[in-house]
Amino acid sequence: MKLKLSNITSSCKHLLLACTLLSIAPNTYAAVTWNTINPHVQFLKQQDKLRFYDSNQVLIEGEKCALLVDTSANFAAVEQLAEDLKKRLKTPLCYLVATHYHDDHLLGMAVMQNFYPDAKLVVHQQVNKNFSLYQTAYTDKLDTYEKSIELSYQRLANVPKEEQPKWRDKLKLAKKRLFRWQEYQLSKPEIVINSRKIIDLGGFEVTLEPQQAHTNGDLTITTNNGSVLIGGDIVDWLPYPGHGELKSWQTLLKQYINDEKLTIIIPGHGGTLTKEQLKQPLSFLTAITEHVKNNKDQSIEQLMLSFPESVIEPYKQEALNIKSSNFFLQAGLNRAKSAE
């Protein structure tokens, strides 16, 4: 009996989705690049094609302790990073800092906590307040993976016979990883930040500050006497405003732009920035709030069409930026409109 091409294509796509979700594709983790900012700070930059879907990490190490900022949403990548740290670190990993609650920054901490149970999770007080929601989000994500694997097994018969052994092996590995991740749990924070806090890693200090900008529970980290800022998604060149505190976010960006000490800015997504480059996200966020304020009677669709072209133009240099900027703009307009 001949299979319809559409059925085969659909089955292959679903199998690919299941395996992608469980990070089976080869070289997924290898594309993350390690960049030395200074002898104490390593910037783990996510590959460009995933820059709007997965996060960067930052490793900071003093003479007595190390601190990791954020984790990937790719649990297999987090496991690989945990293994790599065993080879790289000269000191214990004492702290795990989540810059905010979004999945691609927080949920992978469950994996890291399993490998480094003595490391203390550090979060904003607002994240701590709602932490049970994020623990549920971790289990929900695994439930989604499990359903995808089950459906993929059901559709395996529709895949060409010569392709089946390959996909069966991939799904077997996916199931093995899933069972392992189901044994992990996102453990409660041990350090909750509600005001400026300095952590001494041993001859090297980091300063953590609570913010309300990209979300209502952000953390920023500065090092090297304020010259290096690890700003999470607050300082992304193309920022996602859908959960943002837009006015205070703009104020904070202005503060960074005018900070004479600041020389290196590490975002949650994309490459390092200069203070001059921060003017673009500031312009984007400011235009969103002003556009909504000045056109209160317009629908979101109308606001999208009438949004200043000069502000959005820098984001139209490549397809991924265009797609993401349109989605982010819509989310920002909705956020600003709800705040009016």
State what each model feature region is.
Residues 294-340:
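C-terminal regulatory/interaction regions
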Residues 247-301:
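Divalent-metal (often Zn2+) His-rich catalytic cores of metallo-beta-lactamase-fold enzymes
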